[in-house]
Amino acid sequence: MSTAANDAPFAAHQSRGLSAALDYATGSHARAVVILLAFTLLALLPGFFSIPPVDRDEARFAQATKQMLETGQYVDIRFQDEVRYKKPVGIYWLQAAAVKTGEALGVASARTKIWLYRVPSLVGAVGAVLLTYWAGLAFVTRRSAALAALMMAGSIILGVEGRMATTDAMLLFTSVAAMGALARIYLGQRHQPDEAIGWQMPAVLWTAAAGGVLLKGPLILMFIGLTVIALSIADKSWRWIRATRPLSGFGWMLLLVLPWFVAIVMKSGGSFFTQALGHDMLDKITSAQEAHGAPPGTYFLLFFLTFWPGSVLAAPAAPAIWRARKEIGARFLLAWLVPSWLVFEAAMTKLPHYVMPLYPAIAILIAGVVEGRALAHIRWMVHGTVSWFLFPAGVALAVVVGFVLVDHSLGLIAWPFAAIAMVLSLFAWWLYEVDGPERAVLRALMSSAFVAITVFAVTFPSIPALFPSEMIAREVRATGCVDPHVASTYSYQEPSLVFLSGTATRFTNGAGAAEFLRSGACHFALVDPRSERSFVQRADAVGLRYTLVQRIEGYNISIGKPVVLAIFRSAEPQ
């Protein structure tokens, strides 16, 4: 890495501009909110409206919400005829409210506009960034709190979850709200143990806990509970817990969550708890679900990818964090982070987003060390900052390979944005020792925004083959049918097809697809090559007249395999 003073004037000017933006942000809380809001939207909006529904979790959540809107049944959760009792109702209600609002505002075909279902996740991600700033103010200066929030906003994991119509961005929002309130209660009691605590922070704590429970069950209570236990053991005192108003607070939380839980028990006869707690949560702890098993230590390794670019400073910050572990601020943040992290590492099922609610604690710890100029200068740690450049370079290579393999093109449209991301990250690494870690991470954060543009705004929308369901829905709409009905052979039964083609979408074999076409006009059968022979045989046997609408060649990203489907329709009403 260069330490010379004659590095590019562009980099110096850019560095001053980024630092000036942070200076402006830290001039007042209002300015900080404006800058954080602007950067978070810059990081999250690319591709938000243009990427089709992604299989499988996003499409399942969105389809279950769509069925609520279709049936008016807002207690029960279903995907087609199958009950979906893995998660509580919170995210479905939020998505339904977003779609209803879209309909009221005149959004055409609002119920099949996936971006409307993503709005709660976008709101949750933006809110989580702002709450990271608010939580950070309990521990560090305004500048460090803003830097921590920026690291959250630019992280890879939030960039993914903030664009997905799932629970995790909203869970992050409620978790940071709860932990920020708990931090203020704890620090207040440690600094002034005899001073009476007001009702505001306990109200935030327990209301956020209720929201988290309605989103993803008791997970948020684990974050709160393990933090409280760890702090009480470390302090050798449990007295401070009274300031959280546990009895009245827990009662308030129950008042908020029990109505729906009672309603779903009355509806399901207890099968919700059997599936949600027994089949979903406990099975994830004791066994690897859906091929997502991994050994302990997986989250530690994934962290350096999912929290990039902030994760690059984690190793240099670690020695200072360890030295400060007995300070009350660092103690709280470590209590927030370590116990829950160990639980996740011990669980058999592992997915990158599970530990996301713990990342704000890491961001605040790193930001505090950066401002305190306490980062370690061990050579291998300094050399590790090359990963600021390696990640965008790897993304650029992956984008080109993706275009070549799937779209059979070089993807030239993505090159300028990938180049900007690489240049910014190159300067972040190359001038790390010249300009210091704060300016370096700011450059890397700008690079992350251009990585997002490259991947989400340019690459994914430019390769339609990655989204076969969208291709199918477009071909079916092009026929002019007002109320089309679709059946697909079993080789392609993705939730996105149900979301885009209708709740009545059926899955069958080749012969069943031929029978389906006999049902009437505007019926379409999607037949894979292996099922086409049985389809033709059955069609000939029953005298079915049919036409080929189109052959679709795409790539099923949920299983990582190519997909080829012929779209047939009956030649005339039967």
Model-inferred region functions:
Residues S2-A25, W199, A203, T207, ...:
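Membrane-embedded architecture of ER/inner-membrane glycosylation machinery
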Residues S2-W380, N556-V564:
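Membrane-integral, polyisoprenol-dependent glycosyltransferases
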